[in-house]
A protein has these predicted regions:
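C-terminal motif of bacterial Sec signal peptides marking the signal peptidase cleavage site
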Residues: 17-20
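Subset-of-secretome marker
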Residues: 23-162
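Bacterial N-terminal signal peptides that target proteins for export
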Residues: 1-9
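Alpha-helical transmembrane segments
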Residues: 11-15
Length: 162
């Protein structure tokens, strides 16, 4: 009985070590302009340099010109509707008087970057993903994706130590 208990404790300890040593990391990149802010949040496997998920937050500040606000909302709604039927994609949107926003969550286990049928249905989504998700050696590489978006002006946000 004591041997079983000791073995169980050792196995439980090993399990905690394995869980604690996962190589999953998160990085946030921001591109801010006068009228908009785009944030990419990558969750990736550090050891394999593979992107696991990508969350894109887009916030557009509306001008005081009603026609511009209406056109911006219509364009956002078109883009959101294109994405809704795409597998591995979750889209949410928020409206206020001063800004519109939407969030696109990509689960790389389900999302097919090379799917021509989905690409035809949601061209705006794939135009963005072609910039944010870069393949290298047959997989979506975090380091290649990071290099590409930094070249376009995105700045990595360093996590503050508590």
């Amino acid at each position: 009985m004591k041997k079983i208990l000791k073995l169980s404790i050792v196995l439980l300890g090993a399990l905690f070590v394995l869980i604690g040593c996962r190589s999953e990391s998160k990085s946030v990149f921001v591109l801010q302009t006068e009228h908009s802010k785009v944030t990419y949040t990558y969750v990736y496997d550090k050891g394999n340099d593979t992107v696991l998920s990508l969350t894109t937050d887009i916030v557009v500040r509306l001008s005081s010109v009603p026609e511009y606000a209406t056109a911006a909302r219509q364009r956002r709604d078109e883009i959101v509707n294109q994405m809704k039927a795409t597998e591995g994609v979750k889209v949410t949107s928020v409206d206020s008087e001063k800004e519109i926003a939407f969030t696109v969550e990509i689960d790389m286990k389900k999302f097919k970057l090379d799917d021509s049928e989905s690409r035809a249905k949601a061209p705006s989504l794939y135009e963005t993903m072609d910039v944010a998700l870069i393949k290298k050696d047959g997989k979506v590489s975090f380091s290649a994706s990071k290099e590409n978006i930094e070249r376009l002006g995105f700045v990595e946000q360093k996590e503050e130590k508590k």
